[in-house]
């Protein structure tokens, strides 16, 4: 099986100086699902303002890593998220689960979907006119925050349109705005580029990079295809066969590293355009451009 990864080493953005804070710290960590260990002995730090991708074949435990950080999946070893055990700082985490689409018949406006990031933990349905009447100052602050995140993701032109009438890329921008609404310090994205066209993938990738750099948000993104985000990444976590290799893309996506990880010979080839071809991955566990899973 062959997959392609363009080489963008010379184009990669220089990371902004990292603050002292560490958003994620893991030491000898392992994930357990249904009594089975999915991966083990993972050690890493993700700092504020760092953009990290999680790569690997179907079922290797990519999404499981995000669930461990959210406290939704049991783990062993040391795992700290924003200085606490997983599950203790969820209001400071923005989470976008695997892509969901909205049918064309869905009439709820995009801005109302974004506002669920504020109201989703509360009982009942938000009633804007009642909130404006009973708590005008809070309502005004809420509206300013909504307008701000919608502007940040570039969705102002269509935020008040029914979300079912928005394109896939527009819907995804609105969902990212929902994940940002509470000013998270850590953003966990589970395959946000899945099923998007190439221009939308490029736009979302650049948007996430900008949020990461400008707001010092640590980003951990599970990637179905590393190509669109490769110019922006600081590091990758490549998971296969229960183990992980962590480093810059140039350090990790090599024949030696991937061969050792998969336990079989893997080749990494270059074409005239500077693109990389990863060759020899098992058909049951393709990397980079394979389907999402685990």
Annotated model-derived regions:
Residues 77-91:
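Conserved ABC transporter NBD signature motif
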Residues 162-166:
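Conserved ABC ATPase signature
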Residues 255, 261-294:
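ABC ATPase nucleotide-binding domains
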């Amino acid at each position: 099986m062959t997959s392609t990864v363009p080489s963008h080493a010379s184009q990669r953005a220089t990371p902004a100086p990292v603050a002292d804070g560490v958003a994620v710290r893991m030491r000898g960590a392992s994930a357990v699902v249904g009594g089975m260990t999915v991966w083990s002995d993972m050690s890493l730090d993700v700092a504020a303002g760092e953009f990290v991708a999680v790569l690997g074949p179907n079922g290797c435990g990519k999404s499981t890593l995000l669930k461990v950080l959210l406290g939704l999946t049991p783990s062993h070893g040391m795992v700290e998220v924003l200085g606490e055990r997983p599950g203790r700082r969820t209001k400071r985490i923005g989470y976008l689960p695997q892509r969901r689409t909205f049918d064309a018949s869905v009439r709820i406006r995009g801005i109302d979907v974004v506002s669920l990031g504020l109201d989703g933990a509360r009982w009942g349905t938000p009633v804007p006119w009642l909130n404006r009447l009973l708590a005008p100052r809070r309502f005004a602050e809420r509206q300013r925050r909504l307008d701000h995140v919608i502007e940040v993701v570039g969705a102002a032109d269509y935020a008040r349109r029914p979300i079912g009438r928005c394109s896939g890329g527009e819907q995804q921008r609105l969902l990212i705005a929902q994940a940002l609404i509470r000013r998270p310090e850590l953003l966990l994205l589970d395959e946000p580029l899945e099923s998007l066209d190439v221009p939308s993938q490029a736009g979302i990738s650049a948007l996430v990079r900008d949020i990461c750099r400008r707001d010092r948000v640590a980003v951990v993104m599970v990637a179905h295809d590393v190509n669109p985000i490769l110019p922006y990444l600081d590091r990758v976590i490549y998971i296969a066969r229960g183990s992980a290799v962590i480093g810059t893309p140039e350090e990790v996506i090599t024949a030696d590293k991937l061969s050792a990880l998969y336990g079989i010979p893997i080749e990494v080839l270059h074409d005239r355009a500077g693109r990389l071809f990863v060759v020899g991955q098992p058909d049951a566990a393709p990397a980079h451009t394979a389907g999402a899973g685990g």
